[in-house]
Regions:
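Gly/Thr-rich phosphate-binding beta-strand-loop-beta motif of the actin/hexokinase/Hsp70
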Residues: 1, 84, 193-194
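Short glycine-rich, Thr/Ser-proximal phosphate-binding strand/loop in the N-terminal lobe
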Residues: 1-14
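Short, basic/hydrophobic alpha-helical segments
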Residues: 13-31
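Short glycine-rich phosphate-binding loop at a beta-alpha junction
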Residues: 28-40
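Long, charge-rich intrinsically disordered scaffolds of nucleic-acid metabolism proteins
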Residues: 46-50, 56-183
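Phosphate-backbone recognition surface of nucleic-acid-processing proteins
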Residues: 189, 194-267, 271, 298
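Basic, amphipathic alpha-helical segments enriched in Lys/Arg and hydrophobic/aromatic residues
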Residues: 266-302
Length: 302
């Protein structure tokens, strides 16, 4: 499978049998590693899971760092396969993975929710792009075409949101998790759905890990005489965008976070830095309510 083309192979073949069972009857002692290919890997992931084989999608940047670590210069399908196998068998510290990392079990419903969340995000960006075009175009025919397209996009966005809501309502654990998240002042329907869809680790990891996953954990930059300001980096951008909007609301209306935001501003922090601090608090609160299965304690003050 490459460049959007799928080469079908007939079953059964000796090669396929070797995928289904370990060599010489031995158990597979580490997962089969697959490099992400923008979604083209999903059929293979599903087939391997259906066969009961351990499989994982590798972290792209960590795999690239591992390639540099071992000094691999060649780039071919065969060399990549060997390198992926070695990476899957490597210890956590070599893979850049924390010893207390959490492996999320496959969840078909959450995967559907994640696809809907990705689609809603795409529609949001298309709406923004078309709105910008409408502001600059003067030709009436083009304006009418863009306006009609915008209406269709907004309808599609609403339908996608409703589909996400319906999907969540089919499972009691997701209904309860969404309810708990929305006890946090500032977290509405859209933010709660994004957190459920794109951060399934919430409630099972530490607060520091949750902040790093979303990309709101500041990383220090100090070396020798250099003492640069800490900066956030990495993380899941669609989640961070959603939490940003929640933080804007929380910085004004949350009984705990609004004073916190004002204290940071009074201390001379730039507004964006103060807002990122609010974002981090929101992620910590979200992780805490899902871990404890209790409503947000600050809700008693709201």
């Amino acid at each position: 499978m490459a460049s959007g083309r799928l080469r079908p192979l007939r079953e059964p073949t000796r090669c396929h049998r070797r995928v289904r069972q370990a060599p010489h009857g031995r158990a597979i002692d580490h997962p089969i590693a697959i490099e992400p290919t923008g979604g083209y890997e999903k059929p293979l992931l599903g087939a391997l899971r259906a066969a009961g084989l351990p499989v994982e999608t590798v972290h792209t940047s960590r795999f690239a760092a591992y390639r540099n670590l071992v000094g691999a210069k060649a780039k071919s399908d065969t060399s990549d396969a060997r390198l992926l196998a070695a990476y899957a068998a490597a210890p956590d510290e070599v893979r850049g993975r924390k010893a207390d990392h959490v492996v999320i079990a496959p969840d078909a419903l959450r995967e559907q929710l994640a696809e809907l969340a990705a689609r809603r995000n795409q529609l949001k960006h298309m709406i923004h792009a078309e709105t910008c075009r409408l502001a600059t175009v003067r030709n009436q025919d083009i304006r009418q075409e863009i306006a009609a397209h915008l209406e269709a996009l907004r309808t599609a966005e609403r339908n996608t949101h409703q589909a996400m809501m319906r999907l969540v309502r089919t499972r009691a654990d997701l209904v309860n998790a969404k309810r708990l998240l929305q006890t946090i002042t500032g977290v509405g329907d859209k933010t709660a759905l994004i957190l459920l869809a794109l951060v399934p680790e919430l409630g099972q990891i530490s607060n520091k890990a949750a902040a790093a996953l979303v990309g709101v954990a500041p990383f220090v930059r100090r070396s020798g005489t250099m003492n640069a300001p800490a900066r956030i980096q990495g993380g899941r951008a669609p989640v961070r965008d959603a939490v940003y909007m929640a933080a804007v609301t929380a910085s004004r209306h949350n009984r705990l976070l609004a004073p916190f935001y004002q204290r940071l501003i009074a201390a001379g922090k730039p507004p964006k830095v103060a807002l990122v601090a609010v974002m981090r608090r929101l992620v910590v609160f979200a992780n805490a309510v899902l871990k404890s299965a209790q409503p947000w304690k600050g809700a008693q003050l709201a």
